[in-house]
Every structure is written in C-alpha cells, then in structure tokens.
C-alpha cells in the first residue's frame, strides 16, 4: 500500500503522530495474547493498538526503507529527514523503533542501494545504523544504545 505525501513537507516537518493505549508490560503482553499489536516505547511502557483500528489508520501503511525519508523525533512523533515532495512515498527504517527478537522481514524489497536485505528487530544494535540515525531512534532505543555503547567501551 504505502503512505504518500499529500503536499510538500519540509525537513523536520511533522509527518505522523502515533497514538494508542499506553500500558505496562504485563497489560501489554495480555493484550498481545488477546490479538492486539504492541510496540515498546519505554521501560515498562507499551503502545497497544487494535489491528482493525491500525488498518483503518493510513499512518500504519508507513513502509520500511533502508534509505528512509522520515525518522523519529520522540516516542510518537515522526518527522521528515529531508525535504519531501508531493506524492513522494513516506518511508522509515523500522530499526528506529522495532525492538523484538522475533521480528523479521526475510526479504526487504525497498530497492535502496544501501538495502540490508534482511530486516530484524535487533537491527538497532548495528553500529552503522546507530551512526546513520544518531538520536533519531525512539528515545527508548536511544537510551538502550547509550547503555550498550557504555558497556562496550568499559
């Protein structure tokens, strides 16, 4: 499907503000068991949403690209990484917010020169992506990256 800009968007312009129900881990895992989708946004804080609602919300058609034109500003705000033209597809690298050991896109089809070909829920751990997206992961991942890098340098 995809998500496309209806009008030009300037660099750092707000593209999407996500929303849902915020729950602790126990509640979120129960909701997942009940068929809801969950996204971790902080220690013991999860955004929980219904797949049906998600499918009605065009922002959830935000496709992955290994060379995205949007990135994270904070827990729920996605902004333009650069100027975006009208009708240009809006893309994001899922490494910026997906943290899930079981998450896998086995064959990325983004077509980027920099395509990783396989996308996982642990891509945020890659040093090359940490440098490429510095400070534009979700804040939760930015903190995890900082902690991980401190442990490595110690």
Regions found by a protein language model. Name each.
Residues 64-154:
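C-terminal SET catalytic tail plus cysteine-rich post-SET Zn-binding segment of SAM-dependent SET-domain
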Residues 1-73:
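Catalytic cores of histone-lysine modification enzymes
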